Amino acid sequence: MGYEGLVEYVVSRLLEKSSLKQEEYVLYKTEEINYKRRKYLGCKSENFLPEGWQLITLERLFYGFYNESLYKKLFTIPEHSERLEFIVDQTERITGISDFGKYMSKILAIDTFFMNEDRHMHNIGVLMDAEEKYHLCPIFDNGAGLLSDIQMDYPM
């Protein structure tokens, strides 16, 4: 632990060189954080929410619509491919976003390429505008990639 901020920065800078549009991911900067007389390297980004918009995580979206946890529902589905299909189908059904499957493909490709092992239903989301219309959210939270947590599995 401790390198997540740097990883966010590096991954976002590498995504600048990809075929993704700038609005498809969050661009991070490094930030020095002083805490209890120690300095830590963190990160920050511009607020990607337009005025009056909200970030709705998939867990919150599903719970708000079905009054049931998405996590609990997913664990009743044995196959990973069926879980992904369920996530895409339900998100498109609830939000009306028609290309959520393509969005999920981008997230999973980024996570695979950068070895991000911390993708979950609280860091995948959609945006809701002031008129309660849903939009794709920029991809964020790639900080567990690039072996940033290697010391947890292999203490040095």
Locate the predicted segments by residue.
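Conserved ATP-binding subdomain of kinase catalytic cores across diverse folds
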Residues: 1-70
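Conserved kinase catalytic-core segment
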Residues: 18, 82-148
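ATP-dependent phospho-/nucleotidyl transfer catalytic cores
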Residues: 47-108
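Primarily interfacial, aromatic-capped hydrophobic alpha-helices that serve as membrane anchors
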Residues: 148-156
